[in-house]
């Protein structure tokens, strides 16, 4: 960090003010822009809590300077948020049952004129099993001025031997969502889905369709075509082989630490192709070298003290071709200050020297305020 940056950040601490209950009621930061280092702007974020210690309202520096707030919360006796008033998103309501599960939620309540306007509000109603584990059964959605529709339904497997064989007992096997049906055919002991089938709505091409799933025979709304993805996993739950709905297959292998070591893809009806041939890692699990099936090799270098990435080099050794050779510089907190590509040449244009590097500047809040670099004039041609 140079002298100018030291001066810029001088006397700009982050301060948190606590009340006598240990609750953070003020967050104070000091903003200074590199272009105006002599001007310091104090920015205060204000929080207010109720007598029980639950957050009641919050205002960011912009709003609190105007005497306004960003959020206002109304909570239940247990502290669950029942009503949220947002300066940007309007007002939303949430009512929970005795178990803490949402029963009704209303969003998009406008407050432009100082009072609630529900002309465009959306209401979601949740239904659960009345006995047993209380699993969700359906979600109904109602837009203001329209009839309610069931946008989602959940169907669970029973306890039969066939379902136990596929590890489906008690699992949600049929999820009817706004796009169609997502059906789980089998899962591994580790919980990894081994076979999943997707069916779309008959009117899936209509963007204005709002599905209303009936309680009986919801399959009548689905198209006949099914898309099945099958997976093979090992005893730890790591995916070894995936066959998608089009019949394309992807295989991956792992090293002794469980990190990806190779990847292969077989297009349906084609030969197997190597995507990632090998990967080397450091003791900390950071990628050091990656060799692809086309012979391209990427190497990574890290700073020993901070373990930050300081260099990435991509090349084709057989062709003696370097595609990129990036070097990174950071400030003490980890923001990227400079990225240099040694694979590119320094160019001269209109009596200007253009080096292959990007430089970034930040203010005292570590917000990006400027970025410079080289742009190829014919890049989009």
Each predicted region: which residue ranges?
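Beta-strand elements of repeat-based all-beta scaffolds
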Residues: 1-381
């Amino acid at each position: 960090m140079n002298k100018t940056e030291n001066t810029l950040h001088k006397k700009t601490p982050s301060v948190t003010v606590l009340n006598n209950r240990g609750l953070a009621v003020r967050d104070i930061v000091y903003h200074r822009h590199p272009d105006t280092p002599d001007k310091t702007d104090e920015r205060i974020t204000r929080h207010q809590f109720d007598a029980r210690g639950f957050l009641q309202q919050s205002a960011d520096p912009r709003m609190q300077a105007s005497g306004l707030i960003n959020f206002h919360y109304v909570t239940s006796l247990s502290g669950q948020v029942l009503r949220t008033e947002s300066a940007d998103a309007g007002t939303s309501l949430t009512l929970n049952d005795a178990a803490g599960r949402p029963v009704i939620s209303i969003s998009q309540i406008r407050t432009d004129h100082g009072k609630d306007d529900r002309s465009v509000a959306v209401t979601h109603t949740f239904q659960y099993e009345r006995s047993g584990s209380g699993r969700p059964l359906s979600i109904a959605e109602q837009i203001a001025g329209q009839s309610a529709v069931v946008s989602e339904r959940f169907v669970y497997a029973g306890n039969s031997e066939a379902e136990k064989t596929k590890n489906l007992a008690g699992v949600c096997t049929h999820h009817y969502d706004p796009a169609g049906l997502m059906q789980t055919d089998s899962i591994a002991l580790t919980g990894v889905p081994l076979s999943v089938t997707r069916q779309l709505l008959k009117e899936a091409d209509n963007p204005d369709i709002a599905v209303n799933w009936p309680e009986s025979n919801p399959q009548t709304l689905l198209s006949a075509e099914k898309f099945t993805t099958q997976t093979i996993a090992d005893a730890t739950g790591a995916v070894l082989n995936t066959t998608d709905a089009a019949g394309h297959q992807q295989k991956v292998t792992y090293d002794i630490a469980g990190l990806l070591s190779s990847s292969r893809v077989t297009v349906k009806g084609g030969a197997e192709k190597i995507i990632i041939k090998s990967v080397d890692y450091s003791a900390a699990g950071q990628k050091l070298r990656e060799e692809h099936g086309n012979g391209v090799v990427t190497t990574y270098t890290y700073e020993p003290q901070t373990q930050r990435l300081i260099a990435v080099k991509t090349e084709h050794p057989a062709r003696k071709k370097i595609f990129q050779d990036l070097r990174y510089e950071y400030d003490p907190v980890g923001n990227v200050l400079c990225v240099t590509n040694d694979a590119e040449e320094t160019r001269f244009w209109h009596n200007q020297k253009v080096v292959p590097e990007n430089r970034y500047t930040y203010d005292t809040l570590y917000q990006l305020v400027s970025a410079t670099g080289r742009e190829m004039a014919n890049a989009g041609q």
